[in-house]
């Protein structure tokens, strides 16, 4: 398949909004590795989950909040951020995390990733305020009550819009599949067929799994991993072009920072095209499609807006996409892991950042393919593609 994305040396143009927000960026304070009290002079940052916390380099993260219209008090109340409900994630790191009720934001504990974010704060903020798929850190803070570090970030898989909360009436507006993809043997699925998959990892200390075929949950998990590795995603030419320009730009940035082991998270919704038109596209009195679609993902500008839509084989597909878990330097621990896993299934996740980033670009350039079907009018002009504009 011929590549339709931007060349690896090109970068997507900066939006006017990015230029305005980043004025005076070089005059911001020097990056500090110390947390600063929320009552510091000039600070307008609120509590998190009803607790006073101390913030890291908030002059920078204010720019992220401004760029992406994230309210300063987005997780201020206990109702939105209930610390008692925070629990370990199912990922290998197992860092504790909590979704807000609308699933638009995540509060996540930072363990070994904390010093990495401190080291790249300035570069990260400048990059993410452009056109990027990197997860947006709105706050980086220290929780005094348990002496741990956290971030507040956006979720690339938000819950349904308020008008689609009725799951029976709008069952199509649910994620049918969720993928966590690295371009290596670690590719996996978290949701398949609309059902959450139990993450049954095969570890050397799980003797029953090592010495037997394992239970049904393990088989389902393994089969889903194989599918995640082999499946393709179909997009129309323009949709694929704007997606790949971001993936390439982000991979270049992460390589430059010496980061690796990150993932592309992909949430997929789908339904027959006739159902989509009838239930999700809104028309005026003349029958012209005005707006509508599945619940929104990223809404900041035409080049940023999500989901990415395509029509293929009579189905409408909506893709919600972002890059997560990128705060990993290729340190001594990763180098040791590389040699320990040298006999493991290839390709490996623990490789040098230059290798990882190049492979990441190439893998998704092949995985996101151009559908042969024509782009529908509701996606090209006058339809849902024009709903969201910078401003």
Name each region found by the language model.
Residues 1-391:
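Polybasic, positively charged surfaces/segments
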């Amino acid at each position: 398949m011929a590549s339709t994305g931007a060349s690896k040396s090109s970068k997507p143009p900066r939006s006017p909004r990015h230029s305005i927000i980043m004025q005076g960026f070089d005059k911001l304070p020097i990056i500090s590795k110390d947390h600063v009290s929320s009552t510091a002079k000039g600070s307008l940052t609120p509590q998190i989950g009803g607790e006073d916390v101390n913030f890291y380099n908030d002059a920078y993260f204010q720019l992220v909040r401004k760029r992406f219209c994230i309210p300063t008090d987005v997780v201020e109340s206990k109702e939105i951020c209930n610390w008692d409900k925070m629990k370990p994630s199912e990922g290998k790191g197992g860092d504790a995390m909590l979704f807000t009720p609308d699933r638009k934001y995540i509060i996540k504990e930072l363990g070994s990733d904390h010093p990495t974010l401190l080291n790249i704060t300035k570069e990260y903020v400048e990059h993410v305020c452009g056109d990027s798929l990197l997860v947006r850190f709105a706050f980086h803070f220290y929780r005094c009550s348990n002496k741990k570090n956290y971030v507040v970030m956006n979720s690339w898989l938000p819950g349904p819009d308020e008008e689609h909360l009725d799951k029976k009436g709008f069952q199509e507006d649910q994620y049918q599949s969720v993928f966590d993809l690295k371009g290596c043997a670690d590719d996996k699925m978290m949701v398949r067929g609309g059902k959450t998959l139990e993450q049954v990892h095969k570890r050397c200390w799980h003797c029953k799994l090592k010495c037997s075929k394992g239970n049904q949950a393990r088989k389902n998990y393994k089969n889903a991993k194989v599918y995640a590795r082999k499946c393709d995603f179909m997009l129309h030419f323009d949709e694929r072009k704007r997606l790949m320009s971001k993936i390439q730009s982000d991979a270049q940035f992460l390589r430059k920072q010496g980061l690796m082991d990150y993932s592309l998270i992909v949430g997929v919704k789908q339904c027959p095209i006739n159902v989509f038109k009838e239930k999700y596209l809104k028309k005026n009195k003349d029958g012209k499609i005005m707006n509508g679609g599945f619940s929104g993902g990223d809404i900041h500008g035409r080049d940023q807006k999500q989901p990415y839509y395509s029509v293929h084989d009579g189905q409408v597909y909506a893709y919600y996409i972002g890059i997560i878990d990128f705060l990993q330097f290729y340190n001594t621990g990763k180098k040791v892991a590389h040699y320990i896993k040298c006999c493991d299934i290839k390709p490996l996740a623990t490789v040098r950042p230059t290798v990882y980033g190049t492979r990441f670009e190439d893998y998704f350039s092949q995985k996101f393919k151009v559908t042969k079907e024509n782009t529908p009018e509701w996606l090209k002009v006058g339809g849902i593609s024009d709903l969201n504009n910078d401003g």
